[in-house]
Design a protein with these regions (language model features):
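Conserved ABC transporter NBD signature motif
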Residues: 71-83
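Helix-to-loop junction immediately C-terminal to a conserved catalytic motif
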Residues: 63
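ABC ATPase nucleotide-binding domains
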Residues: 233-267
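Catalytic Walker B motif of ABC-type/P-loop ATPase nucleotide-binding domains
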Residues: 170-174
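A short, flexible loop at the N-terminus of ABC-type nucleotide-binding domains that lies
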Residues: 2-34, 38-46, 97, 119
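The feature captures the beta-strand-to-loop junction immediately N-terminal to the Walker
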Residues: 48-50
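Conserved ABC ATPase "signature" region
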Residues: 20, 109, 123-141
């Protein structure tokens, strides 16, 4: 971790959820019911499940953007709101005005907001932003307008923004949505590298992507059940989604080349 980060207590879990209930008051509908989940440091885990099952809600609870009605939630040993600056969030969509001349470097510098006492970016902030861009191999685009780069490049820039905050936990919402297969393969390699030093939590509908990268999968549909990815099968997915599902395992080792029969199997 770079300057300004707190030491990680590797003996304590990164995220602990115990008997958590959450309901949106305006809907009067329980979204999450008696949820229990533990995510350890340097885990890579994905949250999968049907629309409305509570995946994004659980992510927002971990980020401290929502408060549960019941139960306990600790992130890095603290209430989520107390450690927001130690969490890096990559949204599914980046809303921006295409007429706004904000540059790639400007976007990454936003990851340093809240770290300066007077609100001005320091030299250390600019160094951290450029280092994050270099990690993403995006430093050559620093001066380009964010609106002018491709979807896959924007995804990398948003991850760089999260890295610029020196985040200990990265939370990504549907990172493979709206990007092509080459960008997905690049993202796969990138997440594997980042997982060497950071805990990775991803919301995804792409079960194949989950099967190729993550150590564990958390099936979310009001309640949460976790499984090692190796144990995930079509029957589990069918029960989770409530219908017939075909599960295709991705093989990123076959990217850009023809795979022999059996190397990329459906389950």
């Amino acid at each position: 971790m770079s300057e300004g980060s707190s030491a990680i207590n590797a003996s304590a879990p990164a995220i602990v959820v115990r008997d958590l209930d959450f309901a949106y008051s305006h809907k009067q509908l329980t979204v999450l019911d008696k949820v229990n989940l533990q995510i350890n440091h340097l885990d890579s885990i994905c949250l999968v499940g049907p629309n409305g099952g509570g995946k994004t809600t659980l992510l927002k609870l971990i980020l401290g953007l929502l408060t549960p009605q019941r139960g306990e939630l600790r992130v890095l040993g603290h209430p989520p709101a107390d450690v927001r600056l130690r969490l890096g969030y990559v949204p599914q969509y980046a809303y921006y005005d295409p007429l706004c001349p904000v540059t790639v470097l400007d976007v990454v510098l936003m990851g340093r907001l809240g770290m300066q006492p007077l609100g001005w970016y320091r030299a250390a902030d600019r160094r951290a932003a450029r280092k994050a861009l270099a990690q993403m191999k995006m430093e050559h685009l620093a001066a380009r307008r964010f609106a002018d780069i491709s979807g896959g490049q924007r995804q990398r820039v948003l991850i760089a923004r999260a890295l610029a905050s020196d985040a200990e936990i990265l939370l990504l919402d549907e990172p493979t949505a709206n990007i092509d297969i080459q960008s997905e393969q690049s993202l796969f390699a990138l997440l594997k590298e980042l997982n060497r030093t950071r805990t990775i939590v991803v919301v995804t509908h792409d079960i194949g992507f989950a099967s190729s990268f993550f150590q564990r999968v958390a099936c979310v549909n009001r309640q949460v059940a976790t499984h090692p990815v190796a144990e995930l099968n079509g029957q589990m997915i069918q029960e989770l989604y409530g219908g017939e599902v075909s599960m295709i395992r991705h093989d990123h080792n076959c990217a850009g080349q023809h795979c022999r029969p059996g190397e990329n199997r459906g389950v």
